[in-house]
UniProtKB/Swiss-Prot annotation:
This is Elongation factor 3. Disulfide bonds: none annotated. Residues 1007-1031 have a biased composition (Basic residues). The keyword Hydrolase applies. It comes from Candida glabrata (strain ATCC 2001 / BCRC 20586 / JCM 3761 / NBRC 0622 / NRRL Y-65 / CBS 138) (Yeast). Disruption phenotype: Inviable. HEAT repeats lie at residues 5-42, 43-85, 86-123, 125-162, 166-203, 205-241, 242-279. It is an enzyme of class 3 (hydrolase).
Length: 1045
């Protein structure tokens, strides 16, 4: 007798013992069967006949409980043999049926057996086991069976959490249906199992909302409130099938709600979550549930803003899910289907002469391979560990491993492949190689992306405004990036664009010494190497220009022995000489650099690699910026400003009385000199220029030459020490400072809309109310004591109240103080009555009361209909002209905007009053390449004058015609076309009733049309008609308005 025959004989005997066992010795008989089966059965032998008999015995009412007990013991989680496991799974449908048996003893044993199997099976065999359980839930009418199966699923979650997570899209609908069962016990068990199953949802963003999500399945009335809760959530974690399986039921119901606000929020959640999906196949099973709802809402929602949000969600879903333009859904990958993997392994086993009796084992192996494919486990060792014990049932181990490895390769080839990005090819020391995610406020910036930096390399970090370039730099500097080396392992220094204002009065040397980076001698030597003179080293930081502050920050970073320099806009405020110095320094210093810059020439000359933001990932390209653009043509706007598709538009400037051509000077400066108090010499001296509506002026010069001082005098921020400055009475100037954020830094907790409303709520620009040309100083107060002789009485002006035309100029209504006992001790000035007010010509007033006259001119300009209603819609439309969408303008705080978005807000706010002159100090700071291109085109099309201070020749070369070269306090103009009087060129016509006008309270001003002037013949005809009518009517005749002439 062979060993195999001996084994079969023992099994037959054990089977007989078990079939006649009583309740008292059933457990012992079952243990004997389990011990033998899970022991060392003869190689290449499996007890398939035993399990055929076992299945019949489980069905038999008389022996059912005994043999169920045997299965429970066979499925002992510690001892279940691979040669037995596939056959145990074939019994699951029968065991499920027995869990609903009328005999409570059988029910109990069947339920216990199902839980034992859930705990015992190989976790990757879930695809062979779970379908039996879900089919039982869908088909049975027995509530006891449902409760037992639900308990088995709960046990399976504990045993195979990661594998259940991938099966959630199939499991959740079945559990949801079961939660609606009429039987209380089933409802409670289903809810408990659903709660257990959601433990596989490894997503911190929705973790705390899972109880509400489960409640929504049972009670759809809770959907609106839950959507509201989730609408305020920041999504940063990767979205997996498990996450979507619990979220999609809620979102599909949210899209079908009546309230537009719920539909909008559901679209926002879909938009935010889909951006975090790594693989299109993750979202593929859910497209048919979300896409129709979004499409229907976009077609039917009346609110334009909600429709726009819905469209955004629709576009994101289509992009992430690879949906075509005609909404043909992509095919779901079948790489992990049992049919696919079974076909692959059967093909490989054709020449191996595998006996038909091993078919169940082969199918089981195919199921396990399918799960490994779904998990994207492609490692050879993992496949050997999980599957080799099952392959060796019918093959020798060495041969089994060869076949299994080929099986793995062919199965993996069926997985849909995403884009493959080659990493850098050259060798070198890794300073950083980490994977991380990054969010800012309510926005996800990077999701599970890799950052790899090597020693001595120079990297350019590129991406649009709001992508998170500066945020990434700060996060690295603050140690908030997972896996990035600590300062002890790798010294990383963030070189900021500007030094904190708290150090304004600190000397340059003391500032660096306070950083504890070396001795005074070493620090002084390094500063001298960076170009600082001895005088500059001892100067306060506040007296340094922006370019020298940048060099100071860089010197401090180098003294810290930095391994990595993080340079955020390093060329801001640097003139061409210092930019060339910086290029040479970075190229020769040997320090790894990560650079954010909008200066394409600088990146071209410095960078060896470009790290680009693409779909919440960082992708690395070898080469400088020009090489990057060749590989990525969509980024052409980084290289050519004109290539930008983004469009900005400035509002058309208001009409200026007396200005008939664009050449006429609206600002005129003659022999102007300015000197800061306490300095040894003037900053600028003997400067003359004029500006008109046609001006396109570039102000150039080295750092510290006096460019910003010149502009501050032009805009009224500073008053000249000597010389004359004339500005047209109604001229409005928009001035964006070099440090653009200075405009908004005290309003960070307002939304952009609230900031604009605050700034212009009085009708005037509150940002300009503290300008020097509007403040009354001692000299002004002294001049305002001028005594006027009016109607034979000495008077001083108390106030100026109104303005009217007077010949070719204006005259102003003034109230007075009457002088008594002038020149004596008892001199006094008594306020006069309003009836004593008088009108004084402008020429007489400006000598002594120029600032009061300017205030009246400002109010008259606003009263003439130039004021705009501060409504949310008007502000959103205005900001949209400068690249800010409504979501940012009305729903986001300024604090959460990126640097570029803040600059766009400053541009929008400064141009709110339809300026005649736009003055930009270093506009290339902080704006990305797309925005710079759009700004360049908008300034070119602007109907008013433009004055730009910049070191970027690229930005001004096609924009400006006139150049003011400032050097050593002197200004040399070139290319100018200054005229006296109106000058030549086309005439400007005043546009009547072009658009609605509003007063300071936002009320519409009804403008009556001017009556056409009649000719002499028309007047005679009208007179005859009037006389005829008068003759006919006699005393009853009354003239009408249209008969007056």
């Amino acid at each position: 007798m062979t060993d195999s025959d001996q084994s079969l004989k023992v099994l037959e005997e054990l089977f007989k013992n078990l079939s006649v066992a009583t309740a008292d010795n059933r457990v012992e008989a079952a243990q004997e069967v389990a011990s033998f089966l899970n022991g060392n059965i003869i190689e290449h032998d499996i007890p398939e006949k035993f399990f055929e008999e076992l299945a019949k015995a489980v069905k038999d009412k008389k022996t059912s409980a005994n043999f169920l007990e045997a299965v429970a013991h066979i499925a002992n989680e510690a001892n279940l043999s691979p040669s037995v496991e596939p056959f145990v799974i074939t019994l699951v449908p029968e065991i499920c049926a027995k869990a609903g048996d009328k005999d409570k003893d059988v029910q109990a044993v069947a339920s216990k057996t199902l839980v034992a199997i859930s705990k015992a099976i190989n976790p990757v065999a879930i695809k062979a086991y779970l379908p039996h359980l879900t089919k039982s839930l869908e088909t049975t009418n027995k509530w006891q069976e449902k409760v037992s199966v639900l308990a088995a699923i709960s046990a399976l979650v504990d045993a195979a959490k990661e594998q259940v997570a991938l099966r959630m899209p199939e499991l959740i609908p079945v559990l949801s249906e079961t939660m609606w069962d009429t039987k209380k016990e089933v409802k409670e068990a289903a809810t408990a199992t659903m709660t257990k199953a959601t433990e596989t949802v490894d997503n911190k963003d929705i973790e705390r909302f899972i109880p509400q999500l489960i409640s929504c399945i049972a009670d759809p009335k809770q959907v609106p409130e839950t959507v509201h809760l989730l609408g305020a959530t920041t999504f940063v974690a990767e979205v997996t099938p498990a996450t979507l399986s619990i979220m999609v039921p809620l979102l599909s119901r949210g899209l079908a709600e009546r309230e537009t606000s719920i539909k909008r929020k559901a679209a926002v959640i879909i938009d935010n979550m889909c951006k975090l999906v790594e693989d299109p196949q993750v979202v593929a099973p859910f497209l048919d549930k979300l896409l129709p709802g979004l499409k229907n809402n976009y077609a039917t929602i009346a609110d334009p803003e909600a429709r726009e949000v819905t469209l955004r969600g629709l576009k994101t879903l289509r992009r992430v899910g690879n949906v075509t333009e005609d909404d043909v859904l992509p095919e779901i990958s079948h790489a992990g289907d049992i049919e696919t993997t079974l076909g692959v392994i059967n093909e490989l086993l054709k020449g191996e002469n595998v006996a038909p009796r091993f078919k169940i084992v082969v199918e089981y192996i195919a199921a396990m391979a399918g799960d490994l494919i779904d998990e994207r486990v492609i490692d050879q060792q993992a496949w050997f560990t999980h599957i080799t014990p099952y392959m060796t049932i019918f093959m020798h181990e060495r041969n089994a491993k060869d076949v299994l490895d080929e099986f793995r390769k062919r199965a993996v080839d069926n997985i849909p492949v995403g884009p493959n990005f080659d990493d850098e090819e050259d060798e070198g020391e890794d300073l950083c190689n980490c994977e991380f995610s990054l969010a800012y406020g309510a926005k996800i910036l990077l999701n599970k992306t890799q950052l790899r930096l090597k020693r001595g390399r120079r990297y350019g970090l590129c991406g649009p405004n709001g992508a998170g370039k500066s945020t990434l730099m700060r996060a690295i500097a603050n140690g908030q990036v997972d896996g990035f080396p600590t300062p002890e392992e790798c010294m990383t220094v963030y070189v900021e664009h500007d030094i904190d204002g708290t150090h304004a009065d600190t000397s340059v040397l003391d500032f660096v010494v306070s950083s504890e980076v070396g001795t005074k001698e070493a620090i002084t030597a390094k500063l001298v190497e960076f170009g600082f003179t001895e005088e500059m080293i001892n100067m306060p930081i506040s007296s340094l220009s922006g370019g020298w502050k940048m060099k100071l920050a860089l010197a401090r970073a180098v003294l810290k022995n930095a391994d990595i320099l993080l340079l955020d806009e390093p060329t801001n405020h640097l003139d061409t000489v210092n930019v060339a110095w910086l290029v040479n320094y970075l190229n020769t210093c040997g320090i790894t650099s990560v650079i954010v810059s909008h200066d394409s020439g600088f990146l071209d000359n410095v960078c060896q690699y470009i790290i680009h933001y693409e779909g919440l990932k960082l992708r690395k390209y070898k080469g400088n910026l020009s090489e990057f653009v060749k590989k990525c043509p969509t980024a052409q706007s980084y290289y050519e400003l004109g290539a930008s598709d983004l469009e900005f538009k400035f509002p058309e400037p208001g009409y200026l009385e007396g200005v008939k051509t664009k050449q006429k000077a609206i600002v005129k400066v003659s022999n102007m000199t300015f000197q800061y108090p306490g300095t040894s010499k003037p900053q600028i001296s003997d400067i003359s220029f004029q500006c008109s509506l046609s001006s396109r002026i570039a102000v150039i010069g080295p750092n510290g030459a006096g460019k910003s001082t010149l502009i501050n005098v032009l805009t009224g921020e500073l008053l000249p020490t000597s010389g004359e400055v004339y500005t047209h009475e109604n001229c409005r100037i928009a001035y964006i400072k070099q440090h653009a954020f200075a405009h908004i830094e005290s309003h960070l907790d307002k939304t952009p809309s609230e900031y604009i409303q605050w700034r212009f709520q009085t009708g005037e620009d509150r940002e300009t109310m503290d300008r020097a040309n509007r403040q009354i100083n001692e000299n002004d107060a002294e001049a305002m004591n001028k005594i006027f002789k009016i109607e034979g009485t000495p008077r001083r002006i108390a106030g100026i109240h109104a303005r009217r035309k007077f010949k070719n100029t204006y005259e102003y209504e003034c109230s007075f103080l009457l002088g008594e006992n002038i020149g004596m001790k008892s001199e006094r000035w008594v306020p006069m009555m309003s009836v004593d007010n008088a009108w004084i010509p402008r020429g007489e007033l400006v000598e002594s009361h120029s600032k009061m006259v300017a205030e009246v001119d400002m109010k008259e300009a606003l009263a003439s209909g130039q004021f705009r209603p501060l409504t949310r819609k008007e502000i959103e439309e205005h900001c949209a002209m400068l690249g800010l969408d409504a979501e940012l303008v009305s729903h986001s705080r300024i604090r959460g905007l990126s640097g570029g978005q803040k600059v766009k807000l400053v541009l929008a706010a400064c141009s709110w009053q339809r300026p005649h002159l736009i003055v930009l100090d270093e506009p290339t700071n902080y704006l990305d390449r797309d925005s710079l291109g759009a700004l360049s085109k908008a300034l070119k099309a602007f109907e008013g004058g433009v004055i730009i201070i910049t070191h970027s020749a690229e930005f001004t070369k096609n924009l400006t015609e006139e150049v003011w070269a400032v050097k050593d306090g002197k200004m040399t103009p070139s290319g100018h076309n200054w005229v006296s009087g109106q000058g030549a060129g086309p005439r400007i016509e005043k546009k009547e009733d072009e658009e609605d006008k509003f007063d300071a309270m936002g009320n519409k001003i009804a403008g009556g049309k001017k009556k056409k002037k009649l000719s002499s013949a028309e007047l005679r005809k009208k007179k005859k008609e009037r006389m005829k009518k008068k003759k006919e009517l006699g005393d009853a005749y009354v003239s009408s308005d249209d008969e007056d002439f």
